[in-house]
Structure formats: structure tokens, C-alpha cells
Amino acid sequence: FEKVKPINEAMWARAAEITGVPGIAEEYYGYYKDASAFGACSYHSRYALYEGCKTGSKDGQPVAPLMGNMKGFDGGAGDFQMGPLTFMLNYPDHCVLYRFIPRSITETDMELVWYVNGDAREGVDYDKEKVAWLWHHTSLEDEYIITRNSEGVNSQFFEPGPYHPEYESTLMEFISWYLSTIAGLKA
């Protein structure tokens, strides 16, 4: 985290002016046990992209017109959480919403929805394959990892290990909230 701190701080300093969105770099954490009410998880943070990247695309260059009140590209992306199982990654020109839908103890569906400016016309202002490229590939890679992890966890040889307190703290919070929830305890 220290390695990217100066890059993030530089992006945060310019974000509101370049994007035209006051407070865009302000963080908010209110999820799982810290949510204002059951299921009312909400979270926002903004972080810098790689040098020279304006958006989340194959080459880091814009794939659609700016959305909403955005005035420019600040080299950042916003992470949002809405409820315990719905997340959104927002770039100035597009965003992807992903929702996890548990179906059973071993099955979960993941729904992905991409958004662009409401006035943008497919094939004219954006190419949906270019908009979806990064998170389509990321989701395929995630599915591969998750499937292999599930096979391992369901193996008779599986022995759980500890979570990393720095890199997996959010996962640890989710598990604590989830176990309390299914046990009928107040989260």
C-alpha cells in the first residue's frame, strides 16, 4: 500500500477539479457489521490507475463518452459497495456492476452489467466489446480461480489456513458478518 500511496495522493488532489465532481475522492466505509442497518452496506473509495491510463480498458484509453457530470479523466477509478453482495467499479466513461447471487452452499451466480452514458449510441459512441473487455477477462480469470479453490475446499484433504490480516481483512469482516447473520445473531 505504501508503494502506491504517492500515486493515489496525486490523483486524489486533482480528482475533483478534473472530473468536476466535488468530493469524488472522499472515502466512505459502512459495510457488514459497520453498516447503518442490516443489509445496508455501503462503501466508496477511489484509487489511481496505472500511469497513462485514463480508464479500465485494454489499452487504458477511453472506450465511451464521459458519464453523468464527469468533465474529464483524472486517472482514477471508484469502487462502490451497495448491500452485502453488490459492487460497482466506476471509471469516468463506463462502469461495471457485479452482483453475487448465492444459489446453494456450493453455487453462486455472478451477474455483470456494464453502463455507459445514457445518450451514447452503441456502434457510434462506443463498442460494447471494448467496454466489457477488461472485466470480461477478469471475470473469466476469477471464475477459474474460484472453481479451483472450490474443488480444493471440497476435497477430503482440505485443511483451512489463516487469512492474511492485511490483505484479506474485508473477507474476514464479510465472513464474520455472514456467520452472525445465518446464525440469527445481530450483525
For each of these PLM feature ranges, what is it?
Residues 1-187:
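C-terminal catalytic domain of Rieske-type non-heme iron oxygenases
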